[in-house]
Amino acid sequence: MNSNSTLFVRNLAFQTKQDDLTNFFSDVGPIKHAVVVTNPETGENRGYGFVTFSMLEDAQRAAKELKNKKLHGRILRLDFATPRKRSEVDTDQNKAVKKTIRQDNRPRLIIRNLPWSIKKPQHLEPHFSKFGKVREIKIPTKGGGRMCGFAFVWMKDRKAAEEAMNSLNGTEIDGRPIAVDWAVSKDAFEATTLKDASSEEENKEFVSDEGHSIVTEDASADSESEEEVDGHSEGKELAGESEEEGSNVDDVEDSGDSSSDKNSINHEIRDNEGLEDTVFVRNLLFECTEQELYNHFRQFGPLAYAKLVKDPATDRSLGRGFIKFRYEKDCQNCLEMASQLPTQEPTEAEKRFLPSVLVDEGIDTDSVSSRFLLHGRLLKVTSAVTRKEASDINQKSLQERKQKMGKGVDRRHLFLLNEGKIAADHPLFNSLSETDKTLRSQSIAQRKKLLEKNPTLHLSLNRLSIRNISRHIDPKILAMLGRQAIRGFMDDVSKGLRANITEEEENLDKGHRLKRGKSGGVLKQAKVETEKAGAGRSKGFGFMQFISHKYALMALRWLNGREITVKKIIDAEIEWARKHKIPEPQLPNIDYNDRPRRLIVEFAIENIQVVKRRQEKEKSFRQKAKQLKQQEDEDNLKRKRSESDVEDNEAKEKQAKVARIIQRKRMKRRSRKN
């Protein structure tokens, strides 16, 4: 780079791109090029860049005029770029010493136990920028873009880094406690790990002041399996342990009550043994120690151990623990007394506020509840379960809570993206052409991208997208194909060629199904998209809408990847009509090249706003139709009334005429007699 006409630009915002830098400096004068230095791994910019002007005067003017100007909300720092000078007389030893000193002094922090919501440096920067300037943030990922759960933060100076570490260590980000520490080199980390591994067996157990064996926390617990647990339900909270403390739930073998055994605990993991004498305790004070827990539960009988459940990242208590009794009868007695504790469902008003973890002050000290009071908290005691049972209960209760709260429900039906996908192990995969494989893979990628970008889009439960159809297929023939798909699927099921729709799939849209049409069919609509210009030529794709998800799923699984021709559709329809002795439909003659096409069938992507407008339009149309029908009925009634009135008048006139004739005849008779 030409140092005379090149500016070194610092303090760039993370979202600043090369074009933004070019546009910002081009107002001063012509620019040869502008570069934003990025991280080759993540693609995020490092917060600095270079701008090279065509003229030296423009570079000097830019350094003066744009100094302390803001770009994307950050004040730029401008200097003339100079080549990096390297000393050629440095020996290898001096370089190694300088590198060590530089690494030891650079203010880099490691943040562990990050929540999965922290995916980009911008998400983490606000937490550290209040302590000083953040130079760089790296968030490593695994294969497939999965997060590793930790990150590195490089602060401008060591004082700011130290202040950030002291302030943020142990705090929560998105409900998850983080651990902040100085970052060390990989070699130093591996050396420390080996040293810790060699002394692990020696530190695996220790003895309390009273001689009772206390089991240490298993540091190998997986922090990724933690789940937040609501404190209202017994069964739900028990499941909160998940796999994190799976080894803690297991049996710790007790070889007797001799004094020599108090200093030795066999920490073998046995999933299905020894849980009859173990209880699980919740609602503990975070500051509660294992010794305090041990001393409190000794009132129920001799104990083997008392153990707290700790966060492996911060080594802090999670407010839960395990108590193992020496005798099963003492454990059962404790559980029986715990079952007598008062349980009261919160009122609707109480649900609006956080539940109190403290017991009422007016509690009777002689009651059962007083035996489960520790640090002013009423403990919740239940039976301990194995890791597998805890995981099953946790998953079940988590789903129940999410459904009650309206969370975790796939309202956009994204799981339907996999329907219609022909994987490499599918029987049809080898029969697909390379073009067909490419089209399908591109379609999946495009659909995923659309759904990620626009949250108003969702996958329809009963509407299918049919692509790669012949341009000679009109809505009438497409409707025939839809009906044939349902019949074909049911025939395959009866012959044992394919599995039927499951009960869960059948009830997926329960309460949201469409009404059958006048014909009583399951196909609600068949539509072929046509070009607006010209004679309305088909675009080669269309849509089918069924009355329920069940029939849409049947049609998709039968049609997807199937080769069809217009002749096959027409012949199948004629055969069906003859078999069931119904009039054959009037079908067009095939006088064109009817080559086979393999269908691509997927659940259609719909916009919730468009769907709402369509529903409102249909509702308005139905209301208008109803009003027109009512008006027509009223008009018919009026017409009938008027017609009946005319008929009544005619009848009355006729009767009057007859009466007059009779009266005249009577008058004539009387006149003759006289």
From Swiss-Prot:
Disulfide bonds: none annotated. One of its GO terms (molecular function) is mRNA binding. Its main location: nucleus. Residues 662-674 have a biased composition (Basic residues). Residues 5-83, 107-185, 277-386, 486-579 form the RRM domain. SUPFAM superfamilies: RNA-binding domain, RBD (SSF54928). Residues 219-229, 240-256 have a biased composition (Acidic residues). It comes from the Eukaryota. The modification Phosphoserine is found at residues 223, 225, 242, 247. GO terms for cellular component: nucleolus; nucleus. Keywords: Nucleus, Phosphoprotein, Repeat, RNA-binding. It is found in: Nucleus, Nucleolus. It holds the Pfam family RRM_1. Gene3D superfamilies: 3.30.70.330. This is Uncharacterized RNA-binding protein C4F6.14. It comes from Schizosaccharomyces pombe (strain 972 / ATCC 24843) (Fission yeast).
